[in-house]
């Protein structure tokens, strides 16, 4: 289990309060699909994913990105029980969707990049470390059913 300090929790929560979930979520998922094109196979129903501009403008990518980032909001509220918080999603991604758990880490990295882009002044090394710890912990929680 990952332990978050009071300072780490406060840092994550302070930035989260400023996040536009739709924008950051959509951009994060779009970046994942562009930079790691093999991840597109999990989104066959999303339609046109044939170019960077098609992915960035795809409403299904934006909607699912928002959904993914909303789950991070849930994580922030339950930082002391991430495995329990993500148990159902872990089971879904493992047993039904068969998503390679490495993709969770890759998406976490995309979220960090987008946050750093949108909040460059607030995204200090300490902030980045707190968010990196959270995205890694969420990735591990999502991969829990794989073990």
From Swiss-Prot:
Annotated InterPro entries: Globin, Globin-like_sf, Globin/Proto, Hemoglobin_b, Hemoglobin_oxygen_transport
Protein's name according to its UniProt entry: Hemoglobin subunit epsilon-4
Any one GO cellular component localisation term in the record: haptoglobin-hemoglobin complex
Tissue-wise expression: Red blood cells.
Annotated Pfam families: Globin
GO molecular function: heme binding; hemoglobin alpha binding; metal ion binding; oxygen binding; oxygen carrier activity
Organism for this UniProt entry: Bos taurus (Bovine)
Family: Belongs to the globin family.
Function: Hemoglobin epsilon chain is a beta-type chain found in early embryos.
Gene that this polypeptide is encoded by: HBE4
GO terms for biological process, alphabetical: cellular oxidant detoxification; hydrogen peroxide catabolic process
Residues engaged in binding heme b: 64, 93
């Amino acid at each position: 289990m990952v332990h978050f300090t009071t300072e780490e929790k406060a840092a994550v929560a302070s930035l989260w309060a400023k996040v536009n979930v739709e924008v950051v979520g959509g951009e994060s998922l779009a970046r994942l699909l562009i930079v790691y094109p093999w991840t597109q196979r999990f989104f066959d129903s999303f339609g046109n994913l044939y170019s960077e501009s098609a992915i960035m403008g795809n409403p299904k990518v934006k909607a699912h990105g928002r959904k993914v980032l909303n789950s991070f909001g849930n994580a922030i509220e339950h930082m002391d029980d991430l495995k329990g918080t993500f148990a159902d999603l872990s089971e879904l991604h493992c047993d039904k969707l068969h998503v390679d758990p490495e993709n969770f880490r890759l998406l976490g990295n995309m979220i960090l990049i987008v946050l750093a882009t949108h909040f460059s002044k607030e995204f200090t090394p300490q902030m980045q470390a707190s968010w990196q710890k959270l995205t890694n912990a969420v990735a591990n929680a999502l991969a829990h059913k794989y073990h």
